[in-house]
Every structure is written in structure tokens, then in C-alpha cells.
Amino acid sequence: MIKTFLGAFAALSLSFSAFSAMKIDAPAPGFTLTNSNGDVVSLSDYEGKHVVLEWTNHLCPYVKKHYESDNMQKLQRKFGAQEVVWLSIISSAPGKQGYVDATEANQLTEERNAQPSHVLFDPDGHVGKLYSAKTTPHMYIIDPQGVLKYAGGIDSIKSANPADIPKAQNYVDIGLNALLSGQSIDKKLTPPYGCSIKYKS
């Protein structure tokens, strides 16, 4: 009984620790993942640049809201032109909603005219848990010094209705504009909204 309790406590502690690594205004957790072209990509590759992390699941209605309206792509294009690195991360486990292979990921990028710097695969969910990523979309901004400056929702209206996009405050747009202008972000941590990430059980 005691061993069972201690084992459960250890598992709970590990889970809590994994989901508590992310802290605003602290160094962003480093990671290395494979992209949809089979290349190895590390966060450290982009030291000196602003980086956006976007957790995504193409079947999620909340993700569809921002892609079918071209809202996400507009952000990718706007800030890509300003040398911001955009990393779209798929943490759906094999066999679960949102999981795709490399060919499917590249097809989705082409079909949606998306402009991420890379689409990255996190099938065991370890990077998602490092960042306490809970939903799709869940957005993060990292500054050129590698410090996490924003984590949360893409905007202020928690709905899957594209009609709400023009009425919402886009936290990613506001945050990146501030950082690129040498200013600080006012809202550094906001509640994410969307579909739960389909992590490996």
C-alpha cells in the first residue's frame, strides 16, 4: 500500500513538474524536434531572434477559426517579414485527433497557404508539457535573449466563430508589435482557449 501510494505520488509530482517548467520572464525551456521536412530543429538555433510557438491541431474548430479566416496566416506573413521565427508544434499523439505525418503536414501548410518557419512534431508530448501547453491554439512569444515574454490565448474572445476575430484583441499581434518596438508586453499571461491537446496517454 505504501509503495503504491509513493509510486502514485512520484508520478503526480513528475506530472506537476513537467507542467510547471514554463515561467514568464524566465529563460524559455530549450528543445529539439524534427520538422515536416525531416530536419532537426532546436530552439537554440534561433538565439537572437523573436520566436513564436503555436500549438496546433488542424481538426480543432478553434484552430480552423483562425486558419479558415486567414487570421493565423496573416500573423505569420506579417511577422515573418520582420524576421520573427514561427514554429507550429503538433503534440497530438499517434492515433489521436490532430496527429499527422510529414506528408500530411506539408499538404496542410500548402493547402492553407500557411507561412510557419517550421512545422514541428512532438508526438510524445514532452515539449508541450515543458511549456504547460494545454490547448490548440496555445501561443508563446520568446524574445531574442531566449526569455519567455508571453503565454496564452491568441486573442481575447474565447469562441470558434470567425466573426469574433475583428472584435477581439489579438494578444500575439499586440505582444510582438510591442517587443519589436522595444517596449514591454502589458498582458504577459492570458488564459488559453481551444481544444485540449491530445497528448499521449
Region roles according to the model:
Residues I2-A11:
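Sec-dependent signal peptide recognition
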Residues S15-A18:
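N-terminal signal peptide c-region/cleavage motif recognized by signal peptidases
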Residues F31-V51:
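A short beta-strand-turn-helix
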Residues S44-K64, L176:
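Short active-site neighborhood of thiol/selenol oxidoreductases, capturing the structured segment around
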Residues K49-H50, K65-I89, E110:
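Conserved helix-turn-beta segment immediately C-terminal to the redox Cys motif
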Residues G80-F121:
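Conserved segment of the thioredoxin-like fold in thiol-based oxidoreductases
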Residues N106-D143:
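Short, internal strand/loop/helix patches
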Residues I141-S201:
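Thiol-/selenol-based redox modules, centered on thioredoxin-like
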